[in-house]
A protein has these predicted regions:
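N-terminal beta-strand motif that seeds the catalytic metal site of vicinal oxygen chelate
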Residues: 1-19, 79, 136-139
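Short glycine-enriched loop/turn motifs at secondary-structure junctions
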Residues: 2-4, 72-76, 114
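Core segments of cupin and vicinal oxygen chelate
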Residues: 9-56
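Vicinal oxygen chelate
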Residues: 12-17, 79-125
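Long, continuous compositionally biased terminal/linker segments
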Residues: 43-84, 91
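Short glycine-/small-residue motifs
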Residues: 57, 131-132
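Conserved Rossmann-like nucleotide-cofactor binding loop
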Residues: 128
Length: 139
């Protein structure tokens, strides 16, 4: 039986910058550094874990060649993080603003996705589109 998504790895142009960004933006919501593993090319993969046991992680690894990320090229479109409340969405947005991220959508309702869907969208340092959202009817 499929249980969910275990982890997603993002290849970053500057892994230390990306670690600092994600820890600054999502650290206040519980994302933390779980472990560092060696990748198949000898690179370090930094896994930032979600706070609930068994809920997965996001891996950040150093790129070996420069290549600009394109949102609509084959591959990743965006990564969405689920949070408990609208206040958590607002916290992530404030962290993204403080980190200098390009904001795509400030926190707001997206009823086309779900009646209670509330989200913010921004770009990480490599241009990956990040979404932080809740579908719970809480503040």
């Amino acid at each position: 039986m499929l249980l969910g998504l275990g982890h997603v790895d993002l290849v970053c142009s500057d892994v230390e910058r990306s670690i600092a960004f994600y820890e600054h933006v999502l650290g206040p919501l519980g994302l933390g550094n779980a472990a560092v593993f060696e990748g198949e090319r000898g690179e370090s993969i930094h896994y930032l874990r979600f706070p609930r046991p068994g809920s997965g992680s996001i891996g950040l690894r150093q790129a070996f060649e420069e290549q600009e990320f394109h949102l609509y090229a084959p591959g990743l479109h965006h990564v969405a993080f689920a949070v408990d409340s609208k206040a958590d969405v607002d916290t992530a947005h404030a962290g993204a603003v403080a980190a200098g991220a390009q904001i795509i959508h400030a926190p707001r309702d997206f009823p086309q996705y779900h009646p209670n869907y509330y989200a913010t969208f921004f770009l990480d340092p490599d241009g990956f589109r990040i979404e932080v959202a809740t579908a719970r009817d809480t503040r």
